[in-house]
């Protein structure tokens, strides 16, 4: 266990009081679940979360007081109760050390040292954190993500009775009545044998309403093609009236608005951090893609349904948002040359498949996304924003969250060059240039 934790967190953490703690001591204490709390002292929601999380942490750990108290480990025993095997580590986005110190001072858990900014960025990228506050739970032995939305855990299970909050099968979470907009009620068992789109959306969200209009047409085309497909709307509306108004535009099913517990469990199951989000499942309830929104917008005729992920994507207006999700390899080509984009995809696909398979075997997301970028206004804007040369072909890795780029400017790009470039990046052998 200690090897994984040291690789993830480094050798030292600090307490709120500034004392150093050896990471390997967490293994000695029998920690089974690790919470990573991503936040910042300047964020009011983070301040609110810290207060509720301190009470939650105290209750689960059995500390003397359900709030800030002595350093982690207080009250630990040789064979702690399972819920005491929880530890939390704060990962800060603060840019001012004094503000960071003031914020962590009263935290009863551990924190990544302020100086570990590079490690902070690695954690953001590894777990695809897109906003703060965020709280995720990991199996402390394997590193596998147990729960991506710890904020809902604190709200829904304040006593920690469901510890360690591992994922449950979709069939179990969705079990219960589902509605159609005409008032008809169906049991979730009616989904048997169908691909399912789980659609997290809300009427107050303009991008959601835009996607819904497109999705209605996609749903119709898929059904007319004879595919067994159903969509389940999971509302984030702020009132039942808004839910009803929005749902009236939809030809598919919905979790009843009044069933807040089931809606929350679905959000927890898929770690939803923003809307609109469309998760596409196979008939066994396993995730095919979390990028249903991008797929629907890119595939007007739904010919690629059910949209199994492609190792290499062609960069477009609709999928460019994925550049912000973590490091991305982007191969820029001269698309005026017929077949250049397809040849570029074939060039980098073998290494993309190898990386994806390697991390899938570890039940982890791949640390890189892979794109080919042709010549268009969006690509020109990306080159301008990242201050890249006009050369083509041009092999790059862009890390927007770290505001860093890595450029391999050579006359000829071969599979061996691509693989060496990727491996050197993953081994942290490349020197970044600022974006």
Curated annotation (Swiss-Prot):
It is found in: Cytoplasm, Cytosol; Nucleus. Keywords: Acetylation, Cytoplasm, Developmental protein, Differentiation, NAD, Nucleus, Oxidoreductase, Wnt signaling pathway. It comes from the Eukaryota. The modification N-acetylserine is found at residue 2. Pfam families: Thioredoxin_6 (PF13848), Thioredoxin_8 (PF13905). CDD domains: PDI_b'_NRX (cd03071), TryX_like_TryX_NRX (cd03009). The keyword NAD applies. Residues 167-321 form the Thioredoxin domain. Its EC number is 1.8.1.8. Associates with the phosphatase 2A holoenzyme. Interacts with PPP2CA; the interaction is direct. Interacts with DVL1 (via PDZ domain); the interaction is direct and regulated by oxidative stress. This is Nucleoredoxin. It comes from Bos taurus. The lineage of its organism: Eukaryota, Metazoa, Chordata, Craniata, Vertebrata.
């Amino acid at each position: 266990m200690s090897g994984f934790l040291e690789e993830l967190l480094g050798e030292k953490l600090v307490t709120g009081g500034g004392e150093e703690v050896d990471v390997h001591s967490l293994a000695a204490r029998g920690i089974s679940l690790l919470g990573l709390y991503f936040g910042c002292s300047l964020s009011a929601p983070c301040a609110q979360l810290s207060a509720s999380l301190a009470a939650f942490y105290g209750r689960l750990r059995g500390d003397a007081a359900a709030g800030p108290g002595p350093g982690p480990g207080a009250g630990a025993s040789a064979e702690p109760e399972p819920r005491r095997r929880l530890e939390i580590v704060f990962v800060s986005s603060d840019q001012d050390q004094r503000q960071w110190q003031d914020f962590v001072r009263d935290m009863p858990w551990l924190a990544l040292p302020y100086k570990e900014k590079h490690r902070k960025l690695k954690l953001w990228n590894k777990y695809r954190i897109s906003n703060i506050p965020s709280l995720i739970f990991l199996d402390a032995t394997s590193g596998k993500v147990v729960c991506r939305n710890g904020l809902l855990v604190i709200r829904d299970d304040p006593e920690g009775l469901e510890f360690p909050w591992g994922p449950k099968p979709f069939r179990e979470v969705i079990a219960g009545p589902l509605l159609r907009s005409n008032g008809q009620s169906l049991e979730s068992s009616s989904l048997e044998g169908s691909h399912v789109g789980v659609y997290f959306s809300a009427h107050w969200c303009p991008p959601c309403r835009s996607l819904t209009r497109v999705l209605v047409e996609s749903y119709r085309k898929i059904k007319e093609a004879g595919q067994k497909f159903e969509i389940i709307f999971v509302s984030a509306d702020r009132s039942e009236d808004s839910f009803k108004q929005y749902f009236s535009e939809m030809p598919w099913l919905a979790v009843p608005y009044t069933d807040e517990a089931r809606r929350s469990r679905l959000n927890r199951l898929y770690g939803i951090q923003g809307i609109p989000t469309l998760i596409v499942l196979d008939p066994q309830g396993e995730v095919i893609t979390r990028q249903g929104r991008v797929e629907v917008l890119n595939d007007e005729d739904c010919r690629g349904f059910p949209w199994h992920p492609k190792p290499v994507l062609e960069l477009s207006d609709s999928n460019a948002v994925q550049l912000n999700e973590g490091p991305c390899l982007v191969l820029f080509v001269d698309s005026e040359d017929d077949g250049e984009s397809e040849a570029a995809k074939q060039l980098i696909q073998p290494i993309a498949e190898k990386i994806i398979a390697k991390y899938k075997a570890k039940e982890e997301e791949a640390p890189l996304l892979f794109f080919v970028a042709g010549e268009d206004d969006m690509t020109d804007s990306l080159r301008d924003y990242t201050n890249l040369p006009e050369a083509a072909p041009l092999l790059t890795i862009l890390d927007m969250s770290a505001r860093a780029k890595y450029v391999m400017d050579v006359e000829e790009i071969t599979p061996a060059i691509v693989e060496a470039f990727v491996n050197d990046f993953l081994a942290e052998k490349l020197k970044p240039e600022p974006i």
